[in-house]
From Swiss-Prot:
Assigned GO CC terms: cytosol; Golgi apparatus; Golgi cisterna; Golgi cisterna membrane; Golgi membrane; nucleus; trans-Golgi network
Organism: Schizosaccharomyces pombe (strain 972 / ATCC 24843)
Gene name in the database record: vps74
Localization per Swiss-Prot or TrEMBL: Golgi apparatus, Golgi stack membrane
GO biological process terms, semicolon-separated: endoplasmic reticulum unfolded protein response; Golgi organization; Golgi to plasma membrane protein transport; Golgi vesicle budding; protein localization to Golgi apparatus; retrograde vesicle-mediated transport, Golgi to endoplasmic reticulum
Name listed for the protein in its UniProt record: Vacuolar protein sorting-associated protein 74
Length: 337
């Protein structure tokens, strides 16, 4: 009798122990059934800010466009003899920050006493862009003393005797730009054997992007009337479309990769294009820009640039002054002298 009672008690206890589990399971089921109605997903607000920022900007940065022009399409690497592109890419970083409204000349009436490239620049928007190199430059400039355009390009290139400022050098710029282009689906990763070593290469996967870049450059340097086509990578709603293209042509010239954009032209037209980019670099490396109509090439360029500049407030011209300062630095490169 007592054994039976004992067994019944055990069974009852077992039943009681199972009930909370059943209630827990049923509660979980009911919770899951209502999950679709009012669920919440955690997110980082910075991701939304960077997404909104990217929608307003071109698909490729100025640095990426210059690198693309320098890359051999099938081999996927830059010329081993090109020692100009590294310095030019650092200048492109400053210009890209200026085009995005983040870096401008310090608002000081006395700045005009100094050469354009020696004027001090300041960071006015420290929000990150989602572009690795731009974000690294933003953090560096934000936490540093105020310096000139020339100083920043020199420091980011590692061209300084000051051991205290060696840390300002941006390292592996070309490789990181190539990785970004791989992520964007424009390049692909490969490895090729050079003598005894395997070297990463990045052949072009989407040639249409590079073709559109070359077309813009050729139009600015050879066309009687400049027309910049609308494309997914360079949409019509972008600000400073024409000025960006001029900066691209001049930067490519300074980086010694412009010839790759002109490979479909005959010898005479190539020589004219190089003469034209020399003129553009001279005209746009001063502030205000020297806008005058050419009799043979780009007759409407002054009008296009004037329209772009007239659409911004006077204070915003301080950003464009940075672009002119970088181009002035380029005029002093050994490769162009």
């Amino acid at each position: 009798m007592s054994g039976g009672l004992s067994r019944r008690r055990v069974a009852a206890a077992s039943s009681d122990e199972e009930r909370p589990e059943m209630r827990s399971v049923s509660h979980s089921k009911s919770h899951l059934e209502g999950y679709d109605d009012d669920h919440k997903i955690a997110f980082d607000p910075k991701d939304l800010e960077q997404g909104a920022e990217r929608e307003k900007q071109p698909r490729l940065t100025l640095m990426e466009e210059v690198l693309l022009l320098g890359l051999k399409d099938k081999q996927g690497y830059l010329s081993f003899w090109n020692d100009s592109i590294s310095y030019s890419l650092r200048g492109c970083i400053l210009m890209e920050l200026a085009f995005r409204g983040k870096l401008r000349m310090q608002k000081d009436v006395n700045r005009k006493r100094f050469p354009l490239a020696d004027r001090v620049v300041e960071l006015v928007d420290e929000k990150l862009t989602g572009e690795v190199l731009l974000d690294e430059a933003i953090k560096m400039i934000h936490t540093s003393e105020l310096m000139s355009v020339t100083s920043w390009i020199d420091l980011m290139s590692g061209e300084t005797w000051n051991v205290m400022k060696i840390g300002y050098q941006l390292r592996q710029v070309r490789e990181r730009l190539a990785k970004g282009l791989v992520d964007k689906g424009i390049l692909r990763n490969e490895k090729k054997n050079f003598l005894l070593f395997d070297m990463p290469t990045h052949p072009i996967a989407d040639t249409s992007i590079k073709d559109s870049i070359k077309k813009r450059v050729v139009s600015v340097l050879t066309s009687r009337v400049i027309e910049i086509d609308n494309s997914p990578s360079f949409p019509e709603y972008l600000s400073f479309r024409c000025l960006r293209t001029v900066a691209l042509a001049c930067s490519s010239y300074a980086a010694n990769v412009l010839e790759n954009a002109l490979d479909n032209l005959n010898y005479e037209d190539r020589e004219k294009a190089f003469s034209r980019v020399d003129e553009l670099l001279c005209d746009f490396s001063q502030w205000p820009f020297d806008l005058h109509a050419s009799s043979s090439v780009g007759a409407n360029l002054p009008e296009l640039i004037s329209e772009e500049l007239s659409s911004v407030k006077e204070e915003q011209l301080l950003f464009i002054e940075v672009v002119a300062a970088v181009l002035q630095v380029f005029t002093h490169l050994d490769s162009l002298l």
